[in-house]
Amino acid sequence: MVLIRVLANLLVLQLSYAQKSSELVIGGDECNINEHPFPVALHTARSKRFYCAGTLINQEWVLTAARCDRKNIRIILGVHSKNVPNEDQQIRVPKEKFFCLSSKTYTRWDKDIMLIRLKKPVNDSTHIVPLSLPSSPPSVGSVCRIMGWGTITTTKVTYPDVPHCANINMFDYSVCRKVYRKLPEKSRTLCAGILQGGIDSCKVDNGGPLICNGQIQGIVSWGGHPCAQPHKPALYTNVFDYTDWIQSIIAGNITATCPP
């Protein structure tokens, strides 16, 4: 049954990629309720407001950005509407958190990644299914998918009740280097967006997934301010570069180190 659910959700994703890229996270269309069983929403015990997102990669582990670390994190799985919970919605807290560096330091172009082990594993359900880690890096020119509960307008902060989705394009890293002059010659980040602007991940989407061919290829990290400007793609942590570290941590090797 779990395999059937996974295959069904991959089919939904493939159909989504075939759509015309007119959907927006900024001011755009709502995700289909059955399209996103793997994203999770993060909030703190003190505040019920979502501040970041993440991705369930198996029943016990969530992948997100290092910049999303907080005290007393609460992780909501199986959520669509913030105001009308799904029957299979579940809430978990971290058991352990892992970073590339013990100091939890990261930069805009390096090591913005955090792996969270849940205190209690989740059960797969209609709206809770893990997303696969990448088997290979994404190709330049790929059409990928972003989704999240981040702001849907650029002139002011407007948070939606349900997540919004968009298709964006994968660019060569050099495209982002031309825009963001402080980027190093090489980094473990992906450059993706829409060059004419109007489509982008934005505030509170941080930590959420960039999905290509049914796999998590990126983690929302940072971009231009305000979001969705022309010729200013966003940057995403390149998950493929960290797969060995992720798999080592999950296997119990908690001293595993990230690639330099």
Swiss-Prot record:
GO cellular component: extracellular region; secretory granule
Tissues where the protein occurs: Expressed by the venom gland.
Propeptide residues, chain positions: 19-24
Location in or out of the cell: Secreted
Main localization category: secreted
Cleaved signal peptide residues: 1-18
Keywords: Disulfide bond, Glycoprotein, Hemostasis impairing toxin, Secreted, Serine protease homolog, Signal, Toxin
Glycan attachment residues as annotated in the record: 123, 253
Cystine bridges: 31-165, 52-68, 100-258, 144-212, 176-191, 202-227
GO biological process: proteolysis
GO molecular function: serine-type endopeptidase activity; toxin activity
InterPro entries linked to this entry: Peptidase_S1_PA, Peptidase_S1_PA_chymotrypsin, Peptidase_S1A, Trypsin_dom
Transmembrane regions listed in the UniProt entry: none
Domain Peptidase S1: 25-251
Pfam family membership, one: Trypsin
Keyword Transmembrane helix belongs to the record: no
Family stated for the protein in its record: Belongs to the peptidase S1 family. Snake venom subfamily.
Function statement: Snake venom serine protease homolog that may act in the hemostasis system of the prey.
Protein name: Snake venom serine protease homolog 2
Species lineage: Eukaryota, Metazoa, Chordata, Craniata, Vertebrata
